[in-house]
Amino acid sequence: MDYFTLLGMPNRFDIDKQQLASRYQEMQRQYHPDRFAGKSDKEQVQAISFASTINQAYQTLKNPLSRAEYMLSLQGIDIANEQQTMHDTAFLMEQLTLREELDDIEHSTDAENLLADFSARLEKMYTVRYDEMVKTLDSQTWDIAADNVRKLRFLAKLKEQVEHLEERLFDGF
């Protein structure tokens, strides 16, 4: 049973996050291992296993990128564990340029302003790519969706690096 079915959600990218959280909490209460304390060892182990599966399903579906990766995995495209390299050289060059720019910002005397501008540009790039990913998932153009997810992973990692740099530069103020 796939995670969407398990949690009673439609198998599509755009899901109701409140409904997802409610369904998760309801299932966690219903299948909590403590409710099986007086049952046989086998039933207790099954309850623990099922509660773990429910938790994994929720964690996967609540995060947009992991949800997209999961949807692709249901189509036989395993992005999460792939070793495939990116073939879009223009995108890779852009990523290298952005990383170099971020390194330069770290050592700049105007780091705060430069980082704010960089972060805004990066957020715009992420939003454009995210919107494209949603369209390709909705239209079930799986290969293009997979390419968008791969690129979003690069951008998400860069956003994390920006957050870490902000912490290093500005937490002392």
Swiss-Prot record:
Assigned GO CC terms: iron-sulfur cluster transfer complex
Transmembrane segments: none
Any one GO MF annotation of this record: protein-folding chaperone binding
Keywords: Chaperone
PROSITE patterns: DNAJ_2
Ranges where the J domain occurs: 2-74
Pfam families: DnaJ (PF00226), HSCB_C (PF07743)
InterPro entries: DnaJ_domain, HscB, HscB_C_sf, HscB_oligo_C, J_dom_sf
Record-level GO BP terms: [2Fe-2S] cluster assembly; protein complex oligomerization; protein folding
Record's keyword annotation contains Chaperone: yes
Functional summary from the UniProt entry: Co-chaperone involved in the maturation of iron-sulfur cluster-containing proteins. Seems to help targeting proteins to be folded toward HscA.
PANTHER family: IRON-SULFUR CLUSTER CO-CHAPERONE PROTEIN HSCB
Summary of subunit composition and partner proteins: Interacts with HscA and stimulates its ATPase activity. Interacts with IscU.
Entries under HAMAP family matching the protein: HscB (MF_00682)
Similarity comment: Belongs to the HscB family.
Name used for this protein in its record: Co-chaperone protein HscB
